[in-house]
């Protein structure tokens, strides 16, 4: 749909002034009359642009420390006036049509994120006039263009040049969608913030409610439609958060390969989050959201080789994540050895990409290096509701471990215990992980009985010819009975790391002592469902 509308008059009022000077210059050069407010007007005037202050246009001054600037009939009449229908009344009241509104809002999110931000500070950064203009212009998109993102400035000028100073209805409608998304996200942030302040605001407590407001408003941006969801009869799409600061599958750049599937994204997230736990060069291989092989070494090539040995059968068609740049030697080893769905690493060398390009279906993603983990929320949908919790960023240090057995672990056992404890955090419960010399030996995942997870881990190790004797065993939660320790002893496990906390801890510790096993308590559980 063309339905072009010329842009003859624009109102500019922005908090984020990135690119606004150049955009205003481009509009002015194309004969567009500029209206503006406050700091934006002063900035444009300083740059020599012909700009009319809104207060001069309306004949009504800004007041109440800038709280009232644009809330005036001459402004909103000019925005909401329907061309060809409201012309007479606009002329009667000396209301000039405004064809474009360029607005972004007070930085509420940045304000409340600052340490020590008071409720009064937050309140003063709630924009009133801005959202009102945005919604007015978006409502009247048939006649008015609303611009809320500086990333649209260049495209708008190009379209105006291609259409003799006009914008099409398709463009105005797309801009209106962005505008309503913008105000919805803005109001959601304010509602979430105020909802989390309720007890403190009413004097019921000195503390605010915390991370969980009484109404939770979420805004995600669609990154891509999927061919289908977890199964082919389910429709699906991938949505991401705005301004994600941590390297993630959501922010990763796909270098090559087919479009990512729903299951690819879920599994890649599991692999990447696991590999982030390690400081040394590490490799994590994931299948169906569970690690099937993990190792750390002096190079990612050796880490991959050792991770693959844990379970070559399950590694087929898996997801492989690294915490170092993917190099040519490692890429060649993977491509020549196995079928892989996705490779993800902070970066990939040009030589590595030349090698992976020979397998065009292999998806290669780079996510950038990460410095730290960013606290956030995890969500789990249930029928009729949503479970919300903090991300599980907990991880014990060596100094926080408690040895509860008679025998102390050796230095190697301690290293292996810490290693497999990190892996167990990412294995579906009930989770058991055997590890030795910084590589997984066997992984038992997702069993209803913890002792059966232990048995499966030992079976997997035996199937691959890996020696369990002398390995460490991690359990994501406490052992309710001694049978898990007896099963571990039967295959030669020499050290067990677990949270502790069972009413039968004494029996479990006694079993470890009976078998000469060193037992370590973390006092931290890592259920994963």
From Swiss-Prot:
Its EC number is 2.1.2.3, 3.5.4.10. InterPro entries: AICAR_Tfase_dup_dom_sf (IPR024051), Cytidine_deaminase-like (IPR016193), MGS-like_dom (IPR011607), MGS-like_dom_sf (IPR036914), PurH-like (IPR002695). It catalyses: (6R)-10-formyltetrahydrofolate + 5-amino-1-(5-phospho-beta-D-ribosyl)imidazole-4-carboxamide = 5-formamido-1-(5-phospho-D-ribosyl)imidazole-4-carboxamide + (6S)-5,6,7,8-tetrahydrofolate; IMP + H2O = 5-formamido-1-(5-phospho-D-ribosyl)imidazole-4-carboxamide. SUPFAM superfamilies: Cytidine deaminase-like, Methylglyoxal synthase-like. The keyword DNA-binding does not apply. Residues 1-148 form the MGS-like domain. One of its GO terms (molecular function) is IMP cyclohydrolase activity. Keywords: Hydrolase, Multifunctional enzyme, Purine biosynthesis, Transferase. One of its GO terms (cellular component) is cytosol. Pathway: Purine metabolism; IMP biosynthesis via de novo pathway; 5-formamido-1-(5-phospho-D-ribosyl)imidazole-4-carboxamide from 5-amino-1-(5-phospho-D-ribosyl)imidazole-4-carboxamide (10-formyl THF route): step 1/1; Purine metabolism; IMP biosynthesis via de novo pathway; IMP from 5-formamido-1-(5-phospho-D-ribosyl)imidazole-4-carboxamide: step 1/1. One of its GO terms (biological process) is 'de novo' IMP biosynthetic process. Belongs to the PurH family. NCBIfam families: PRK00881.1, purH. The IMP cyclohydrolase activity resides in the N-terminal region. This is Bifunctional purine biosynthesis protein PurH. It comes from Salmonella typhi. The lineage of its organism: Bacteria, Pseudomonadati, Pseudomonadota, Gammaproteobacteria, Enterobacterales.
